[in-house]
Amino acid sequence: MTDSPTVPRRFPTQKRSEQTVQRILDAAGELLGRIPLEFVTTSRIAKEAGISIGALYRFYPDKQAIFDAVAVRHVRHFQTWLELEVIQPMERDLKENLGGFNPSKFLANVIDTYIDYLDQNPDFRALALGRLISPGTKERQASPVTGLPALLKSFMLERLRIPNTPELDLMLRVVSEAGERLIAFAYEQPTRAGRDMVIEEMKRMLTTYLFVVPAR
């Protein structure tokens, strides 16, 4: 699989172009949530978006670039949701009682929020669990500097006063990678009860690793 760019090959400089890009991404998302991945082609995306295949290729070179753009858009939406639902409430609690921080509850809330997002967005679930995001895009979204772990890192540095070290960056990368694989394993379980059991074990494991085992 090639590492396709996550931004359009042609930046939309006009409102109409921006609307076309959003129609392409919306159409891809609809198809990803509705039909098997192998049937999601650039031709079907263009048809779903109501544009010509030539118009689609003005902005994206192939379907991998579109998949990556859909994934990045979802990650940004999720970051905003996580900030509102978990990070900001926890920050308010810490201002009142720093000693009351509960790492198990915090990480459980992060994971539960992510699971809820996957359940509500089948297109992102198909991409994330199907490992259809290109390596370069995945690398950027998993980075403690620019990706989702950066949000957790910022919270840990600013609110928990955890030292900023290369070891912390590595631990956040490990948590991100392990969490992704375990969530995929959880969704492979034949029953909802089985899925929930795997997720609960994952919460305990990652909490212990990130907050109990000292950075090396």
Regions found by a protein language model. Name each.
Residues 1-19, 214-216:
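N-terminal intrinsically disordered/low-complexity leader segments
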Residues 20-27, 106, 148:
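N-terminal positioning helix adjacent to the helix-turn-helix/winged-helix DNA-binding module
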Residues 23, 27, 31-65, 69:
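Helix-turn-helix
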Residues 72-78, 84:
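Short, basic, alpha-helical segments at the C-terminal edge of helix-turn-helix-like DNA-binding modules
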